[in-house]
């Protein structure tokens, strides 16, 4: 059964796995602000701070209505030059490494909750002076390092990650509840360990999904872990909540959180990553060559790379949106007649990897050398994951504020040969 405010038919099914964004929304973005107008060499990422703040206001509304604590999952986005636009709205950050903890402390400056599948002694000694919550993946790790917690001069809330053995994520690479999952403790395992010193639980089972998925997940969490829910002080519902996407059921989310908090009298955390920066960033690239292919589709080579600069395109895989173009997604579309006034291209990357193809697209007019191409939704899992494979220059990082008359464009970082060389020796 669903709460009255949760629409089962409205649940979201992984937007980036080839589900197109509304084309009018893309055109609206393109007409409001020209993200390709920055006077620096391409490629570059450009983050719209006005869009960041709009997303933050949505998260802040959930916090106000539920008294929950929403964290930024730094694994998805760690571009700290815009943390000043995020920190006023959020409770803190969710970190998974020493580097993320240090960056969160230095640049975000609020609560830090840490989880990793395993810790070393040196890592914990480095982070314990800085963190507020520490989640262990196993009882082995907690028992090994609890002496460090006791020796700390700060109050550290310790929790266990649990595995409800339920996830609606279809892609196995993103499903944390498979039979071979390394994440969290199953109910029968938790039954056999001591909870002494543990005051919280954490689960993460979702990816780009709606509040109805959380509702169904919590039903299983309660069924399998209820005896522990009455003994703890806090719980983390993890990430994967697509709170800022159009049509997300915020009323449903708030009802779910409030009902759970009232029933168990717990502090509730959420740690979305993508939701914070959804539809806030773009990757601008330049056409270097247009190659005629008499037996297939003409190929456009850009000065960017799926493998190096937008790795989820290869990893998921998915086909990113391009402003003012249409993706060719279905296999049945590959050889379809061109629409009147439409030009079809394979968009390829600059590396020597044969499979470094971004996708197939239809454009309103033919592309030519020097044209700039704008990829949408490029804040999350790009700057924190990109590489200099094949010696490619990393895209620059630019911020703007589309709510101001001049756009307040700031070039935050450009990368040079020295950045490539110093990483290698």
Where are these regions (language model features)?
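Short, positively charged and aromatic/hydrophobic N-terminal segments
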Residues: 12-13, 23
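N-terminal basic/disordered segments at the start of proteins
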Residues: 18-22, 26
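N-terminal capping/small domains of soluble enzymes
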Residues: 29-109, 115-120, 363-376, 380-382
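Active-site-proximal beta-alpha core segment in soluble small-molecule metabolic enzymes
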Residues: 68-234, 256
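Charged (often Lys/Glu-rich) extended helix/loop segments that serve as interaction or gating elements
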Residues: 256, 270-425
